[in-house]
Design a protein with these regions (language model features):
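Bacterial Sec-dependent N-terminal signal peptides
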Residues: 1-23
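Contiguous, structured surface segment used for ligand recognition
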Residues: 20-149
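The substrate-binding groove and active-site-proximal loops of carbohydrate-active enzymes
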Residues: 101-102, 163-184, 201-211, 247-263, ...
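An acidic-aromatic substrate-binding cleft motif
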Residues: 124-180, 186-206, 378-381
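C-terminal non-catalytic alpha-helical accessory regions
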Residues: 130, 134-135, 467-640
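Gly/Pro-rich turn-and-neighbor structural signature
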Residues: 138, 208, 215, 223-226, ...
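Extracytoplasmic
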Residues: 644-802
């Protein structure tokens, strides 16, 4: 056999494979074989979406037929092929055809929309003006195989605190209505389209009193059915009833199960009868009308007695109207705030009900399931926030929530058995686009991120997956060249906001009785640190402007559609520049209050710093105006972006006052070490991107790690060691550690906090839990600190010595 023969045969094989590839050329009719008569609405809706995507990308039309003959795409539903997994799909290229198989109609829909992704259509096509690029042809090689299935059964988002964004945008801009608080079917169809593109299936609708309730708005039920979305409700919205908005409209008397039982039951029964034939995730239990404790019952024991009766009565209604086997009805119980105390007091929640745990509203999961809770038939869920209204301070404006924190906490949640239900409080959707996609992608594919992981094993961070996810997001939206500049800027922006969110920069608080928290005042930062932070923001601000110029050139060359300028502004420029200007406004104001000089000048120029602060405020107004008016989208997002939600003091101009106390001084640090600078005999679990320096590490129970610092800088006979932790909550009861210096007797510290204590508020606002020890020190060249984790769940950020 000659080399010539081998090469000839190889080329023949390659040509054969190429000839059998699935290919669609621009303008070519795409024939799809589908038994639409047997399809559920969700799959039909996905086909309509694909049809529009094909027309947009290829300029081709799509034709549906009921035979596979001469079809280029063949749809099939086959539960057995996926071992009866829910919502699974397979894409396979064979003999010039593309086969899309689904284990059910949801799986088929996700498979259909996977083709849209392969065509280059972003899930944010509509919601971020991500206009797709046009192609001359699209192909998949012979043998292409893409099989996927969800890790979490119920995955979705919660629209919340919509008063200044989504609600006025919907009711006045996108879907104008004379009905106050209108969020109607046109808006919800767009939300559900996004959910399908992100492979989600669950929705908690907006529920503030300012918004007309979902089920009382004509057309909303029908559009949810069309998109195959499970409708649910938060911890204070049992039985598919938005209590905050609906009780005053259709309830009778007080919302008090103890003293008004029949009317409360009728309120729930009317709704269950109405929606019995629709996919609903029923939240069961009871709280107050809106995020308050239930009426009537005062003590924990009384609340337990009432809740026990509530659960029995609610399940009787579900058995009567939805399914006689009530265990087949999806149900959630959310032990939130005072209800968690009732649960811990011994409330018996039926075995088939999913327990939904919560974070502390700032991204730290409060409870991880015990072994007994993990074994429950109903499983465990999570209600997580990347946007929040409440104490100690709102963060509703900019989507600065740390992706690394979300990734770390949701990885821990999955690892500890929270795998049935994931819901994300997203505010108004915009501007939390990346966090939403990260959360839902994790819910979809956690099995591939952490294959084979069990709670008995230590969780090992998969930093490569997160880095790849971030890179893929930005390259998909803007291409590799722009993404190479954008990603580092966004990572630095997230890091700076992790240290202090833009909304926290005035040193004010929400819902506090003490009037001092309503007044803009100094942050406890030194002049050196303030100037360094201003420089960091100037650096990313300048880079963002430079990248904007690169985008304009790419559009001018035809490398990107012009509409991507709007997307660039929404996803990148506005969040970066608005955060930078918020810091400029408040930090230049702080320097001005203290009469500080511009670097290199010997004169008092506080007036010039006041001008910088004022200019930053004006800049935020201008930036927001551009966001709402757009470049090419004709004001599509008008009223979506409000730079001062709830009209809190932090959003005002900084009052021109004179400080009566000096600026804080930094300690004379002997050493300030990143957690990743430690020495350990056992493996270190680095959470890349997490913490003040993006190098936080998880320490497993009984693991000991060491730090070394130079003795030359030690001046006295004692040192203070400040251990700075990511302010997580215990996985069991406590978060303790021990520390020793130079082999001395270990001292013990605690990281956990109680409820909404003052220490928790401080930790939350600075995103660190700091524990200090002052210890005697001898003269030596090198000193060694040993830190040992006494409990599970500790994540170390920094160790500072002074």
């Amino acid at each position: 056999m000659t080399y010539k023969y081998i090469i000839t045969q190889s080329l023949a094989m390659l040509m054969s494979l190429a000839s059998n590839a699935f290919e669609v050329k621009s303008g070519q009719m795409v024939v799809v074989s589908a038994d639409t008569a047997r399809m559920e609405p969700v799959a039909k809706t996905a086909l309509k979406m694909l049809k529009g995507d094909i027309r947009k990308v290829l300029g081709s039309e799509m034709k549906l037929v009921n035979t596979s003959v001469n079809s280029s795409i063949i749809l099939q539903r086959d539960a057995a092929a996926f071992a009866y997994k829910k919502e699974a799909f397979l894409l396979k290229s064979a003999n010039g055809c593309l086969y899309i198989k689904g284990s059910d109609d949801h799986g088929l829909a996700y498979g259909i929309l996977e083709v849209s992704r392969l065509l280059g259509v972003s899930p944010w096509k509509w919601w971020a003006d991500a206009e797709p690029k046009q192609l001359k042809a699209f192909s998949l090689k012979e043998g292409y195989h893409n099989e996927q299935s969800p890790s979490v059964e119920y995955r979705g988002i919660f629209i919340n605190d919509e008063d200044w964004g989504l609600m006025p945008w919907s009711g006045k801009t996108y879907e104008p209505s004379d009905i106050p608080g209108h969020i109607g079917p046109k808006t919800n169809a767009r939300i559900f389209e996004l959910l399908l593109r992100l492979r989600a299936n669950t929705y908690w609708p907006a529920m503030h009193e300012c918004t007309r309730p979902f089920f009382l708005t004509e057309g909303n039920r029908e559009v949810a059915l069309q998109y195959g979305i499970y409708i649910g409700g938060s911890h204070c919205e049992p039985m598919a009833s938005s209590t905050a908005g609906e009780w005053k409209m259709r309830g009778v008397g007080e919302y008090d199960f103890l003293n008004n039982r029949e009317n409360v039951l009728q309120f729930w029964e009317d709704r269950v009868k109405e929606v019995a034939g629709q996919p609903i995730l029923y939240t069961i239990g009871m709280r107050g009308v809106h995020d308050g404790a239930m009426q009537g019952a005062k003590t924990t024991e009384e609340q337990k007695t009432v809740l026990d009766s509530v659960l029995k009565a609610q399940r009787e209604l579900l058995g009567k109207y939805v399914n006689k086997d009530v265990a087949q009805v999806p149900q959630l119980f959310v032990p939130y705030k005072e209800v968690l105390d009732v649960y811990h007091a011994g409330l018996q929640v039926p075995e088939d009900v999913c327990l939904v745990w919560c974070d502390d509203n700032y991204g730290m999961v409060r409870h991880f399931p015990t072994a007994e809770e993990r074994a429950r038939k109903g499983g465990n869920g999570i209600y997580y926030h990347v946007s929040y209204w409440g104490r100690p301070h709102d963060y509703l404006w900019l989507g600065t929530f740390s992706p690394a924190l979300l990734y770390q906490q949701m990885s821990e949640a999955w690892h500890k058995g929270i795998q049935k239900f994931w819901i994300l409080n997203v505010g108004d959707i915009k501007p939390a686009e990346y966090q939403i996609e990260l959360f839902l992608d994790m819910a979809w594919n956690m099995n591939r991120i952490y294959s084979g992981d069990t709670p008995e094993k230590e969780l090992q961070p998969n930093n490569e997956w997160l880095a790849e996810h971030e890179w893929n997001f930005w390259t998909r939206e803007f291409g590799r060249k722009l993404a190479a500049g954008m990603l580092p800027v966004m990572q630095e922006s997230y890091r700076l906001a992790y240290i202090r969110k833009p909304e926290f920069m005035a040193n004010t608080r929400c819902e506090e009785r003490n009037p001092k928290y309503k007044i803009i005042s100094d942050l406890p930062w030194s002049e050196v640190y303030i100037r360094a932070r201003l420089a960091d923001y100037k650096s990313i601000s300048d880079k963002a402007e430079k990248i904007g110029g690169m985008l304009d050139k790419a559009i001018a060359k035809g490398e990107l559609p012009k509409e991507r300028k709007d997307e660039f502004y929404q996803l990148f420029k506005y969040p970066v520049q608005a955060a930078a200007q918020m810091n400029n406004k408040l930090l230049y104001g702080q320097l001005a209050r203290h009469g500080k000089e511009i670097s290199g000048s010997s004169r008092d120029v506080s007036a010039e710093y006041w001008k910088k602060s004022e200019a930053a405020y004006d800049s935020i107004i201008s930036l927001t105006k551009v966001y709402n008016e757009g470049y090419y989208n004709q004001g599509k997002w008008n009223r979506m972006m409000d730079f001062q939600p709830r009209r809190l003091p932090v959003f005002n101009r900084v009052p021109h006052t004179v400080a009566t106390q000096p600026l804080a001084k930094d300690p004379e640090y002997i050493a300030c070490l990143s957690a990743n600078d430690c020495i350990s005999a056992s493996p270190l679990y680095l959470w890349k991107g997490l913490g003040y320096e993006c190098k936080a590490i998880g320490i497993v129970r009984n693991q000991e790690i060491g730090f070394v610092f130079d003795g030359k800088k030690v001046k006295g006979d004692s040192v203070t060691i400040e251990v700075r932790w990511v302010p997580t909550h215990p996985m069991d009861d406590k978060l303790r550690f021990s520390l020793s210096l130079d082999g001395g007797k270990p001292v013990e510290g605690e990281v956990q906090t109680r409820g909404r204590s003052e220490q928790w508020k401080v930790n939350t606002l600075q995103c660190q839990a700091r524990v200090s020890f002052t210890l005697p020190v001898a003269r030596m060249k090198k000193h060694r600190i040993l830190i040992k984790a006494l409990d599970e769940g500790l994540v170390l950020d920094q160790v500072c010595v002074y």
